[in-house]
């Protein structure tokens, strides 16, 4: 019997045995660095001459892995394989599909620290961030497996005398999963298994910065019993392989997590009907945010400062949910700003393989350059309070950066930076603070720190974000507890880890029988 869902607990690294186990996992992963990884098409390993070189962002000279790189021809082969596999996989019982997710979750749980160690090396995640990423991957498998079991018989509808009506869900077809580098295990696994458990076959194109952990997950699903051809692993260029698959007439849906610009490009391309295409493609997209924490004059100011720092600088601000705007009512602006600067100066920036590190590197040279450009813009648009320096000699390290007195319409208050940068804006009162908070094209996460119930209730209705938090930070949604996804340019309003997410990967069918 399947037990009720509970989220995977995070590891307590104050326990010596846990620390030792994690260090052992790091040593194991270090001994496996630099290996070659193939594509997986129909269960067959396919090596290519062209490779994606995955490096450790904390140490540019350390190669994590060399991964085969798909081209259009191999993508077409994978599409034909997935299309063929759909015929049998779509008819596999929901119970059997869910069981594969449960077995995969158990395998990852046994190897939890190993997967987290890969995240330390490939994504530059500090211990706690890596551990949370792995736990979330487990949660997605456990939660979506259970959700499929709830949906397997459909939803009851009314029937008249002499009539039986059934309303149930069937799979869509071949899905293209384009996963991000910032949650290279959790989001990659979640979007993949949501597509699989609903009876679809998948072409997985992971982010080029983090393809190794995705390959490791493909191995887990194979071990869990996933049939060959149901999941095909085809890392490659977005401009070549990504566009080709988005345009392909046999692609039924695209599940994308990434930037606003790429998401818009995919949405536009998917809307075009190509020769031989007999459906309108579905796009499930999560595209980022410009998230704010609002603090009113009746807030717990220490909680406010702690929440801003944790939300702005966890994983170097490389979360779509990260706090990049702090909007403070003028009565308490100076106190909150001063405390945030004080706390930020205490943060330990360094090698994520060291337990004491709070903040590691940003993901790559392009990200480093972009963030440093925004810091220069910030120096013109606001008052630099701390940080602002970068060092890319060995890895891609940027100091946590705080800007004060920024105009709500400034670029660093409007554009997604995706790095360790937070901008402070002063509001006249709470209404003005909400007005500033809603003044972007995004609508992903937000938080309000306040003891005033009327203000919280006002924010509940007027703060237009998909995930709104009261008296806590704006990051760290838990699967099944805080379904995650935003409004406006933050995506297609889907809610990962929520009760209606799987339905996006299926279509409803009604069967009516007279007797």
From Swiss-Prot:
Give the record's pathway. Amino-acid degradation; L-proline degradation into L-glutamate; L-glutamate from L-proline: step 2/2
Gene3D superfamilies according to UniProt: Aldehyde Dehydrogenase, Chain A, domain 1, Aldehyde Dehydrogenase, Chain A, domain 2
* UniProt cross-references to InterPro entries, sorted A to Z: Ald_DH/histidinol_DH (IPR016161), Ald_DH_C (IPR016163), Ald_DH_CS_CYS (IPR016160), Ald_DH_CS_GLU (IPR029510), Ald_DH_N (IPR016162), Aldehyde_DH_dom (IPR015590), Proline_metab_enzyme (IPR050485), RocA (IPR005932)
Where, by residue number, is the active site? Answer: 286, 320
Which key words tag this protein in UniProt? NAD, Oxidoreductase
GO CC terms for this protein? cytoplasmic side of plasma membrane
Q: Which GO terms describe its molecular function?
A: 1-pyrroline-5-carboxylate dehydrogenase activity
Q: Give the family per the record.
A: Belongs to the aldehyde dehydrogenase family. RocA subfamily.
Give the protein's recorded name: 1-pyrroline-5-carboxylate dehydrogenase
Native species of this protein?
Geobacillus kaustophilus (strain HTA426)
